[in-house]
């Protein structure tokens, strides 16, 4: 749509869903900006563009959203670009700033949030028998990815090696997984195949781990299907236990 503030239909989305505080905040920010800054500031793709300007990257700047998997998707795109020979290095960044009162209310209505507000050690305990939900969080993180050859050539301190990537979509429900866990099972198997690894080579799984009965049940089903009886002795947790859910 046009950028001008006198665009006749500028309130159409706002009027269609007045319960969404996001549109109200967007309008408030837009009113405070100079007219020429509105498009650049609110355009989704400008996030990657500004990072490219800041750090001088020359690869394709991509801004994406795959909800909770956005950071992992950014890493996968970087890995695949390096594999294709499009670049030696890739900057993959994940960021989230969606902790609002409305988000807290909606997740609370789903009984998805931990109520251990006064005892943080008991909050957000993925797969624990006494878990009661996750802690909503905000934050960002960045990884510099590069080919192993490039890293060794410059004497880099290598923190980890990405052996494989994989993903699948679950079209069953917005917040619930398919009952047979087939998309999650396929995703794990896709990663193993891409990495050229067997199930027996995996020693730890960092799961989605929302500390909710629905998530824990489906992740256990998918992992036990892929790894069999080994899942009983294999460490499984989630970084949500330390930094919350972004």
List the predicted regions and their residue ranges.
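Conserved catalytic cysteine-centered active-site region
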Residues: 3-77, 86, 109-135, 222-246
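Conserved active-site "lid/cap" helical segment
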Residues: 1-2, 6, 13-14, 187-199
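Conserved small-residue
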Residues: 51, 71, 78, 107, ...
């Amino acid at each position: 749509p046009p950028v001008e503030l006198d665009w006749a239909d500028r309130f159409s989305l706002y009027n269609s869903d007045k319960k969404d505080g996001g549109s109200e905040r967007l309008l408030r920010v837009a009113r405070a900006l100079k007219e020429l800054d509105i498009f650049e500031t609110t355009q989704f793709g400008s996030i990657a563009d500004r990072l490219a300007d800041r750090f001088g990257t020359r690869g394709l700047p991509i801004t994406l959203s795959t909800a909770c998997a956005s950071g992992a998707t950014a890493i996968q795109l970087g890995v695949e670009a390096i594999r294709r020979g499009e670049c030696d290095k890739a900057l993959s960044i994940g960021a989230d700033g969606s902790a609002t009162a409305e988000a807290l209310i909606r997740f609370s209505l789903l009984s998805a949030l931990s109520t251990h507000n006064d005892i943080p050690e008991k909050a957000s305990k993925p797969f624990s028998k006494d878990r009661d939900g996750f802690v909503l969080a905000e934050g960002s993180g960045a990884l510099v990815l590069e080919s192993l050859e490039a890293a060794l050539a410059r004497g880099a301190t290598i923190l980890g090696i990405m052996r494989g990537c994989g993903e699948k979509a679950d079209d069953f429900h917005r917040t619930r997984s398919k009952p047979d866990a087939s998309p999650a099972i396929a995703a794990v198997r896709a990663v193993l195949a891409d990495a050229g690894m067997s199930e027996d080579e995996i020693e730890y799984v960092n799961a989605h781990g929302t500390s909710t009965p629905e998530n824990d049940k489906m992740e256990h089903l998918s992992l036990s299907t892929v790894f069999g009886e080994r899942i009983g002795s294999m460490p499984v947790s989630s970084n949500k236990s330390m930094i919350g859910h972004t």
